[in-house]
C-alpha cells in the first residue's frame, strides 16, 4: 500500500487530496475481504489424554496400509530374558517360602540395589500382516525425537471440535525373517551337501507309493488317524510367560520342517544301503567298549557292584596283563574252552574209562589165578628152613618196585645158595612184577590223558593203588605174617605210588595251594570272567605252582561248579548266577 501512495503523487501532482482519499477507500475494501475469508477453529486438549504413537516404515518396504486386510499388533513378551539367571521358585505349595519376594527385595534395598520392575508397555511391538503366510514386523522405540519439539495429532470430535493429542513414542518397524536360521552344525552339514543333485524321480515315486498306501487304508482308519493327530496338536501345556508365542509360528515351522525332512529323505535314500555296513561295524565297536569290567578283589558289596566304562584304565598298564603275557594264556584258554564246551568228548571219555576198568578187572582175575597156582605148588612141596628164608628175602625184594637185580643177587648170596625150585619161583614172580608195572603205567597214562581232557575223579587213583596191593604175593597179605617183620615192606609200595602220582589223582585235596571251589565261585559270582582271567587271579597269589598243575585243578573245579558260558566277541566268559 505504501508503494501505491508514493506513486500517486508522481502521476498526478496537482490532486494530492483526491489521491489520498482513493487510497483510504482501497484499504477499507481489503480489510473487509480478509475478514470474510478467515476461518477460526477451536482446538481442545482433553484432560484424559489418549496415547498416540507413530509407526515409521522404511520407504523400500513399499508398505501400503490400504491393502492390509488381516493385521495383528501385540507387545513382545521378554519376561524370561528380564528374569535372567534368577531361579524360578514356586510362590506357593511344595518348595515355596513365605514372603520370599518381599524379604529378597528388603535385602537388596539394604545394599542399595533397587530392582527395576518389568513393564510390558516398554517392550517392542510385534506386527503381523496377512495371517500365517504374511509378513512380520518388529517395532523398536526411537529416542530423542520429542526432546526439542512437540508433536500433536489432531482428531475431529463428534461435536465438530478438534481434539489434540500429543505423540508419546516413535517406533521404527523393520521386517522379521519368518524362516529359521541354521545353527553352526546344521550350516556345516548343509554346506557338505551343496554339490548333491536332487533326484526328483525318486520323490515322485515316493509320492505315488504314499498315495497307494493311503488308498489301501480304510477311510475309517484314516479318519481315526487324522483325529488323533488333531488332538495332539490341539493339546498344549505352556507357562503363562509364553502367552505371546503364537500358534502361527509353530504351524509355519512345522511346514518348513516337513519340507526339510522330505528333502533329507530323498538325499539319504541312496546312502542308506552303504551306511548300513558302516553302522554295523560301529555297533560292534561300541559293544566292545561296553565290555569294560571293574576289577576288585574284595568281596564287599557284591550285590551292588556295577560295570562302568573307564577310559583311564586303558591308558595305564595293568599288572595282570604282564602276568598274562608270561603265562601260556591262549593255549590254556583254548584247552579250557574245549573241555567246557565239548559234551561229546565227555561221552567218549566215559566209554574209554569203562573199557579201562574192564581191562583192569580182567588182569585182576588172571593175577588171582596165578596166585592160586603158586599156593598149590607150595602145598605140594614142603620147603626147608633155608628155602623159607630165601622166600622171605625174595618176597621183600619183590615188594619194592624200584629195586635192582644186583640187590636180589646179594640177598640170595647172603642167605646161602638157594635151590633150583626157589629160583624158578623167583623168575615167575619177576614176570608177574613186569606185568603189574605195565598195567599200572597204562592206568596212570589213561588217567593223565583223562585229566588233561576233563577232570578225572580220584577214584581211579585209589583203584590203581588197590590193584597194586592185591597183586602182591599172598604170603605178604596173609594174616599169619601180619606181626612178622615182613609185613612192614608191604606198606611201602602204596606210599611210593601216591608220591609218584599228582595230588589230583592221589586223593589229595584241591585246596593245597589256594585254589578252592569257594574262591572260584566268589570270583565268578562277582562278574563274568574268561578262563585266562580266572587263572591270573590265582597266579597272582605267590604260589610255587606250575601253570600245567594250575590248569588241571582249575578244570576239575569248573567241572564241579558247571558255570554258565557266554561267548562274547570270540571269547568265552564264565559266570555263576
Curated annotation (Swiss-Prot):
A single Gene Ontology MF term assigned here is: TFIIF-class transcription factor complex binding
Q: Which UniProt keywords apply?
A: DNA-binding, Nucleus, Phosphoprotein, Transcription, Transcription regulation
Q: Which residues carry this modification: Phosphothreonine?
A: 341, 457, 488
Q: Which organism is it from?
A: Drosophila melanogaster (Fruit fly)
Q: Which regions are flagged for Basic and acidic residues bias?
A: 257-271, 319-341, 362-376, 423-437
Basic residues composition bias: residue spans? 272-285
Q: Which GO terms describe its cellular component?
A: nucleus; transcription factor TFIIF complex
Entry-linked CDD domains: TFIIFa
InterPro entries in alphabetical order: TFIIF-alpha, TFIIF_interaction, WH-like_DNA-bd_sf, WH_DNA-bd_sf
Residue stretches of biased makeup (Polar residues): 471-489, 496-506
Where is composition skewed (Low complexity) in this entry? 392-406, 438-456
The UniProt record lists the keyword GTP-binding: no
Protein known as: General transcription factor IIF subunit 1
* Residue numbers spanned by region Disordered: 1-36, 236-508
Give the UniProt subcellular location, in the record's own words. Answer: Nucleus
Q: Which positions bear Phosphoserine?
A: 183, 246, 250, 252, 342, 352, 355, 453, 455, 482, 484
Quaternary structure annotation from Swiss-Prot or TrEMBL: Heterodimer of an alpha and a beta subunit.
